Amino acid sequence: LLILLIGWSNPLELQAVIPEEGRGLNPLLQHPAMAIHPPSLYLGFIGFSIPFAFAMGGLIRGKLDNEWVLTTRRWTLLSWYFLSAGLILGGQWAYEELGWGGFWAWDPVENAALMPWLTGTAFLHSVMIQEKRNMLKIWNVVLIILTFGLTIIGTFLTRSGIINSVHSFTQSEIGPAFLVFLAFILVIAFGLLFKRIQILESEHKMESVLCRENAFLAQNVLFVSIAFTVLLGTTFPLLAEAVRGTKLSIQAPFFNTVTAPMGYALLFLMAVGTLIPWRKTSMESLKKNFAWPFLLAFPLTAFIAFWLRDELWSWDGYIIFWLAFFVCATMANELIRLVRLRSSQSEDSAPVALFMVIRRNLRRYGGMLIHFGAVLIFLGVAGKFFSLERDLTLTKDQAQTIGSYQLVFRGVSEIPVENAIHRAAKVEVLDLDGKRLQFLNPAKSFYPTQPQPLTEVGIRRSFWEDLYLIFSSENGESGDSVTLRVFINPLVGWAWMALPIFTLGIAICFLHRPGRLVARETVLKERFRAAEQALGTS
């Protein structure tokens, strides 16, 4: 970092020309999420350097047992959480500020943060196998090397200025330095891994195809495959331009088509992987754990199909709904079974039994809560498959119907704000019975420092869906007519609810203390007391 600051990007370097007035913060960044989103991503990126450093230290010493996994578990969890928070808040910012009706577009800068999150998630699951079964030691080191390397690639893509992105607000000359650093890190890390590969051999082997180890391994392969797909789709246009001089653009349909089946498989394994026993299981056990959740997901999905609009149909959306219901039903089945067992043995009430069940294995049920948050994100994505989009031209005081809403245009007004002027269309939102629900003010914002007006969307939020208005144009000089782009986005708000659920899940996981770590701390405390007593008597 010091070399970068001195050689490439000195923040204290004087400008050649001193402007009379600064341009101020880019208006697109004037959003509450921007106070948290960049620091969260930064903390997530640098946080993964800690388990990486411990792994490299173990390789250098030639001693890499499970100690480094236990010692860095909380750092890994915290880094994963901050990356997750950064991604969710970034999606919320894009949804509210960029004015296109969505929250994820597979933009290169979005992908830069997603890739280490994917491999970091794989690492979090894979180290459980090392802790429980002393397996996959080599794979875990590879995963943490890849995760740290992808944080460097992400920084390079974001800061180098070689890509066009709606999220890129600055350019610098530090890109080549990051590539040199990345190459140096990867050569040293994989060199150490190959040198010490004998000490990382697994102590056990897979005993059955149907076991939790294989479910986690399949999950790992899917996470890494998605990360590789995203990396390929993000960097291939750069490579093509460098080699052939041809400018290419890989758009969202490529990513959606390739990653969707892998995402569905991950959601399925989310239900199956946590309830399959270690080592091996039987078909009878599978039926016991998964039969009724598997069947219950079908009528629940049919209910959603009946509730959604008749003119909208999406196999992808219904597949996600079925998988989400399967995951939730599986988790509910597990909790109900354990609570009943606890109640029958101790005569505790159901709430007390639930508390005691969770308390006995905080890590497991904190992870289950995080899985539920991930299901909410998938449901938010599924809702976009049923999004309704229309361009409406509204005449003053006349209503038009879209979905379950009536929109009445009440005129255009100029609203001065602190550093801009909003030219807003006042739109009254009614239900189909004519009851007023809300006034929305989608606008064009004029900033003195910006050559073009920016879009300010109007959003009516509800538990089930968002009504999302974009002020496209004002028709005529009198302002008696406007054209709006209108979206009805089902379930999009559920994706934002994942963040507080992740927060609670991580907090519960942090309360878990591995027995071996507690024993180690006890030994250290006893040694410290003995040393104090020895010093006191000398």
Model region roles, listed by residue range:
Residues L1-S538:
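Solvent-exposed, non-transmembrane regions of integral membrane proteins
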